[in-house]
A protein has these predicted regions:
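Vicinal oxygen chelate
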Residues: 1-10, 20-114, 121-126
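Conserved beta-strand-loop-alpha-helix junction that forms the acyl-donor binding cleft
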Residues: 13-15
């Protein structure tokens, strides 16, 4: 039996408050926790449906991703990936791969948020 009780990604960004507002808006979620010290967010939790992830400001030992990207892609399965992608674009994200139907039975695309984190938005096709 696994000893894991919980798992979620923690995104490191420059400008956590702006990132939190972006994520809550584009994913239809809410910020359920926010702890700051000296004006820098140390930990904040975004909850959107069954998904949850943390956000924090970059700092000593926790650098934000560079413009070259990061080796992690967050995968979100949603009812309408086109609508989520559009909200992300409206908030300043950029398209890496447009939302389209794929031969493996998904409608999916990938975007980079304004802080460099990559998000795949998808739904399984019938």
């Amino acid at each position: 039996m696994s000893e894991i009780e919980q798992f979620y990604p923690r995104l490191v960004v420059e400008g956590a408050d702006a990132a939190l507002a972006f994520y809550a808006k584009v994913f239809g979620g809410e910020v359920t926790e926010r702890y700051a010290n000296d004006g820098r967010v140390q930990h904040a939790m975004v909850v959107a449906g069954p998904a949850r992830f943390a956000v924090k400001d970059a700092g000593d030992g926790d650098p934000a991703p560079s413009g070259g990207g990061i080796p992690v892609i967050m995968a979100l399965y949603v009812a309408d990936p086109d609508a989520v992608a559009q909200r992300m674009l409206d908030g300043g994200a950029r398209v890496l791969f447009p939302v389209t139907d794929h031969e493996y039975g998904e409608r999916a695309g990938r975007l980079a948020d304004p802080w460099g984190h990559q998000w795949m938005v998808a739904k399984r096709l019938p």
